[in-house]
Amino acid sequence: MSRLPVIVGFGGYNAAGRSSFHHGFRRMVIESMDPQARQETLAGLAVMMKLVKAEGGRYLAEDGTPLSPEDIERRYAERIFASTLVRRIEPQYLDPDAVHWHKVLELSPAEGQALTFKASPKQLPEPLPANWSIAPAEDGEVLVSIHERCEFKVDSYRALTVKSAGQLPTGFEPGELYNSRFHPRGLQMSVVAATDAIRSTGIDWKTIVDNVQPDEIAVFSGSIMSQLDDNGFGGLMQSRLKGHRVSAKQLPLGFNSMPTDFINAYVLGSVGMTGSITGACATFLYNLQKGIDVITSGQARVVIVGNSEAPILPECIEGYSAMGALATEEGLRLIEGRDDVDFRRASRPFGENCGFTLAESSQYVVLMDDELALRLGADIHGAVTDVFINADGFKKSISAPGPGNYLTVAKAVASAVQIVGLDTVRHASFVHAHGSSTPANRVTESEILDRVASAFGIDGWPVTAVKAYVGHSLATASADQLISALGTFKYGILPGIKTIDKVADDVHQQRLSISNRDMRQDKPLEVCFINSKGFGGNNASGVVLSPRIAEKMLRKRHGQAAFAAYVEKREQTRAAARAYDQRALQGDLEIIYNFGQDLIDEHAIEVSAEQVTVPGFSQPLVYKKDARFSDMLD
């Protein structure tokens, strides 16, 4: 009997805002929300973006005037809409019309003369080029003479062809929320996102730790691009060329595994299992598969799974743009048939499109096994039962889509059929497509989904694509999809792909239902298939069950009496979670960052033949019995 991995918390930040309590989802379907939910989310965004202040439970304008949620919507809604989701790259990241560049300049002295200039001796190159000579000058400087042609690199600026990205809400800076000095942006985001996920559970972290053994907590996270800004690998690689020194922090903080390490070391204080599995754009699902495996096998009882990616940098944009992968200004101009480009519609899954849109995002989910969730009264937002991963076989282009995704989608649907039945899959499931917004993706992914739907007798299969709203966050992309799916389970709304006028003519949709308007479901949706396709042949498809199905499974396994006791205990959890949400809406995000605190005294660790006792943990680590190979031994 396998343990069921249930989602008991989720949180993070992307272009839609804070993910916990479905606020990011609400932003994406803001037109379809009731006034109270809409105004609550807008007020929270206004505080995040520093448009209004929150003091003593009241919202205040810059001049101190009290504001009601209705006032905030009336006064700031349009500004919030313009400063969230995919949009033109903002100057705090870079100026897409004037990105710093080096231009090669060749200089030649006039015939019979030399090029001369003064400089400090400390500034001269070592060794001195053969065609340079120096002579003493006043004030301790030297006169440099260059006698032949030479090459210089001079500061210059030029425009990027790509000018849109999925950026965190304008004014929200994760590094301002804790002592983040020297931390790359991706690590800043991982700290605040993991905090949001932990706080969203409504259960004190120490309570969780006290109920499991020290090694029964696991964290699986990371990034695919590593940390490429000046505080990470970007600064490391550029330092010598810029004449700067490499710092002692840039190399270790640049690791792609460092989001995982920061969560263990500064947020959780965990000594449990840890890992960073990468699979291009399917990376989150790779880590989710590991989380599912360690819970179903009993190796862990609590797992934090997520990713953090901060790729809005000139180098990343140039790299993906050189591949022809990104939506360019000119490409969007040709699609729209006008000179004035709407960058908010740059990401167009399954419509007329010209490339994907890079985005930053950090998202985390908290998983528990079903027994622990019941014991602690955890609020269950869904369950994750399987992730299937397959490669593409032999390839020509390493970045082109391939056949592996047929295998993953088909296996995911077959798996769900065995759990919930064919009728539920046919009439109460939906797909969160990879939907990258490239011409190749819209054809190949839609054909895969259409053919699998045909094989299982599915008609009108609802398909959505969250990248239309928040862009493509690379490692974190399928986490954006999963958390959006939880919003659909909660509100019964499937986000429409509102950045397209219509589905492109070459999209296969005989058995699919793809809409550019939000779709409110008459009957509850019970199963979501998360699909992801990554460069290199990294294909993954996950199965997510609704909280209704998860609770039905728990009731059957543990009995009505145990479930009734759980429901009673859950009310306290929900109250604590709601209290955190209200504080967060007021700007109190309660970031967990324990630098150098509660360090474990290694000399106080007690090791015996039966167990290990670790200071600071209420339960010992008891060695598990291993009978895996007992049939092979005498």
Swiss-Prot record:
Disruption phenotype: Cells lacking this gene show an attenuated growth due to a defect in de novo fatty acid biosynthesis. Siderophore secretion and quorum-sensing signaling, particularly in the rhl and Pseudomonas quinolone signal (PQS) systems, is significantly muted in the absence of fabY. In vitro, the deletion of fabY results in an increased susceptibility to a number of antibiotics, including vancomycin and cephalosporins. The antibiotic susceptibility is influenced by changes in membrane lipid composition which lack a single secondary lauroyl group, resulting in hypoacylated lipid A.
GO cellular component terms, A-Z: cytosol; membrane
SMART domains per UniProt: PKS_KS
The keyword Lipid biosynthesis is assigned to this record: yes
Pathway entry: Lipid metabolism; fatty acid biosynthesis
Active-site residues annotated for this sequence: C281, H434, H472
Signal peptide start-end: none
Name of the top EC class for this enzyme: transferase
SUPFAM superfamilies cross-referenced by the UniProt entry: Thiolase-like
Domain Ketosynthase family 3 (KS3) stretches: 78-546
Keywords noted in UniProt: Acyltransferase, Fatty acid biosynthesis, Fatty acid metabolism, Lipid biosynthesis, Lipid metabolism, Transferase
Entries under PROSITE patterns matching the protein: KS3_2 (PS52004)
Annotated EC: 2.3.1.180
Pfam (any one): Ketoacyl-synt_C
Note: FabY is a FabB/F homolog that functions as a FabH.
Subunit structure, interactors included: Homodimer.
Function: Involved in the initiation of the fatty acid biosynthesis. Catalyzes the condensation of acetyl coenzyme A (acetyl-CoA) with malonyl-acyl carrier protein (ACP) to make the fatty acid synthesis (FAS) primer beta-acetoacetyl-ACP. It can also use short-chain acyl-CoA as substrates, including butyryl-CoA, and hexanoyl-CoA, but does not use any of the longer chain acyl-CoA substrates.
Name of the protein described by the UniProt record: Beta-ketoacyl-[acyl-carrier-protein] synthase FabY
Organism: Pseudomonas aeruginosa (strain ATCC 15692 / DSM 22644 / CIP 104116 / JCM 14847 / LMG 12228 / 1C / PRS 101 / PAO1)
